[in-house]
Amino acid sequence: MRLVFMGTPDFAVPTLEAIVAAGHEVALVVTRPDRPRGRGQKPQPSPVKEAALRLGLPVDHPACLDNEFVQKLKDLGVEAGVVVAFGRILPPRLLDAFPQRWINVHASLLPKYRGAAPIHRAVIDGEKETGITTMLMSEGLDEGDMLLKRSLAIGPDDTTGQVHDALAELGARLLVETLAAMEAGRLQPQPQDGSQASYAPMLARADEQVDWSAPAEAVHNRVRGMNPWPGAFTMDEGKILKILRGRLRHEGLPLPDPTGSAAHPGEILQIVGDEVAVATGAGVYWLSEVRPAGGKTMTAGAYARGRRIGPGFRFG
């Protein structure tokens, strides 16, 4: 099948590679323009553009998806389009030019977690399962008819980064399967049940901050949900402290009692080796790895000793 592929971040790269490996002809790869990155802020290509150039595929990053762009796709003999985390909404003129031939790879089990941040939100919410849905694109936000689904278990300590990588590979396999079914005429699109829909909006700064009054499990979910990016944080006397890793239990040690009158949410209960036990609204959370503002990543124990803080000190 002759395709146009539209995607931008590293999540989309395995799908592009799988399409090529499956023998499909990619007439054009469309991605976002080069953007300044790194210390030097030099323009850098998107991960999808890097992959496309490595694969010898033509690349475009049009400023506008207008009628001229639509005609370009028609002139290229495009039969269908694949969209994976492109970062732009496709206008009706583009959808109408190839009706029922735009396939989107979405990182959730639709209709749950429609929107821009389905992986982060699923981990933060403590979901035990997520997955990939391929769907026909529509004008609504992730509202198109579903084609195929595959689920993925989320372990209790899995981070967003780990789930992201697993879903990227799963999405690549499912998209190839979807294209094969489309060519064979076996697809049976299923409408989504809007009454069961939930949304995964883009992350805001407030989403990153740990709420110590929440139960320990919710704190843990937020920390792993923000790993590796953008990173959960707490405040240490007015300064940001990133919390990169932690856990709910410290094997071989009696559980500190956070219910005493002196224990407040965010208060350090004890320091054991590399880890720091902190009281929450219900239970104890062990900080394992942190990074102070402008500093390097270190163990929580090393940070506490360097700061000369201990039991009784309270994070905000």
Swiss-Prot record:
Keywords: Protein biosynthesis, Transferase. GO terms for cellular component: cytosol. One of its GO terms (molecular function) is methionyl-tRNA formyltransferase activity. SUPFAM superfamilies: FMT C-terminal domain-like (SSF50486), Formyltransferase (SSF53328). The keyword Transferase applies. Attaches a formyl group to the free amino group of methionyl-tRNA(fMet). The formyl group appears to play a dual role in the initiator identity of N-formylmethionyl-tRNA by promoting its recognition by IF2 and preventing the misappropriation of this tRNA by the elongation apparatus. This is Methionyl-tRNA formyltransferase. It comes from Heliobacterium modesticaldum (strain ATCC 51547 / Ice1).
